[in-house]
């Protein structure tokens, strides 16, 4: 079953197209790793798929509320404990997987610590543990292993495998080999947007502010 389908997508940063014609599909039980040089638009593409900004062109198809997005920022409530952070998100998504998330990301010993007191790596593990309590089938992950040591990377890779085995899917932008031999790789370099004079898609501000608000 296809959980995410992207068809001829053009995405922009600062009003300028950065990627165009991006097409791929992601089925249940599968993972896709995005690769490409810094600045090519991996984060912009992920933000667009997560619904944080509109595409310039193209189509994205997915189940309603199908995506759980983990950005560079961990999105933690600093004054809440590790457990309370997960309980907060579990309540929002009406799930009962806090214990699983704590165990999967090796956070049991830290469950009563305030998020503000955690190290960078511990905060990252907690941020990723949030994925486990969303109950959403498609994980969209932007450099998920930043600040993680080798042991924590292995924990995260195992969490991804378990998610795939349960019928989920994962889309990741990462330069680190997670050991997921089953993951496909999509190089974004061929989708780098052409300038308008070379036939590329015009950006949101190419006609000035008057045109943008018509």
From Swiss-Prot:
Keywords: ATP-binding, Cell inner membrane, Cell membrane, Cytochrome c-type biogenesis, Membrane, Nucleotide-binding, Translocase, Transport
One Pfam family it belongs to: ABC_tran
GO terms for biological process, alphabetical: cytochrome complex assembly
Recorded GO CC terms: plasma membrane
One annotated GO molecular function: ABC-type heme transporter activity
Coiled coil (residue ranges): none
Keyword Cell membrane tagged: yes
Membrane topology designation: Peripheral membrane protein
Keyword rRNA processing in annotation: no
E.C. number(s) listed in UniProt: 7.6.2.5
Binding site for ATP: 36-43
Domain of life: Bacteria
Domain (ABC transporter): residue spans on this chain: 4-214
Reactions accelerated catalytically: heme b(in) + ATP + H2O = heme b(out) + ADP + phosphate + H(+)
Function of the protein: Part of the ABC transporter complex CcmAB involved in the biogenesis of c-type cytochromes; once thought to export heme, this seems not to be the case, but its exact role is uncertain. Responsible for energy coupling to the transport system.
Subunit structure: The complex is composed of two ATP-binding proteins (CcmA) and two transmembrane proteins (CcmB).
Family per record: Belongs to the ABC transporter superfamily. CcmA exporter (TC 3.A.1.107) family.
Official protein name in the record: Cytochrome c biogenesis ATP-binding export protein CcmA
Species of the source: Rhodobacter capsulatus (strain ATCC BAA-309 / NBRC 16581 / SB1003)
Organism classification: Bacteria, Pseudomonadati, Pseudomonadota, Alphaproteobacteria, Rhodobacterales
Gene (UniProt): ccmA
């Amino acid at each position: 079953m296809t959980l995410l389908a992207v068809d001829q997508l053009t995405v922009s940063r600062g009003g300028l197209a950065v990627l165009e014609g991006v097409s791929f599909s992601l089925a249940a039980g599968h993972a896709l790793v995005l690769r490409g040089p810094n600045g090519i638009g991996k984060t912009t593409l992920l933000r667009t798929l997560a619904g944080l900004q509109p595409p310039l062109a193209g189509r994205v198809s997915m189940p309603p509320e199908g995506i759980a997005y983990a950005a560079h920022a961990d999105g933690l409530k600093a004054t809440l404990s590790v457990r309370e952070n997960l309980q907060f998100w579990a309540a929002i998504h009406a799930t009962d997987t806090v214990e699983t998330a704590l165990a999967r990301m090796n956070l049991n010993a830290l469950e009563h610590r305030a998020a503000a007191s955690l190290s960078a790596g511990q905060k990252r593990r907690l941020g990723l543990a949030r994925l486990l309590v969303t109950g959403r089938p498609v994980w969209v992950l932007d450099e998920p292993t930043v600040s993680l040591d080798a042991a924590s990377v292995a924990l995260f890779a195992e969490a991804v495998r378990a998610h795939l085995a349960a019928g989920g899917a994962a889309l990741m932008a990462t330069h680190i080999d997670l050991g997921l031999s089953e993951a496909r790789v999509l190089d974004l370099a061929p989708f780098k947007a052409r300038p308008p004079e070379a036939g590329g898609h015009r950006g949101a501000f190419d006609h000035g502010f008057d045109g943008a608000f018509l």
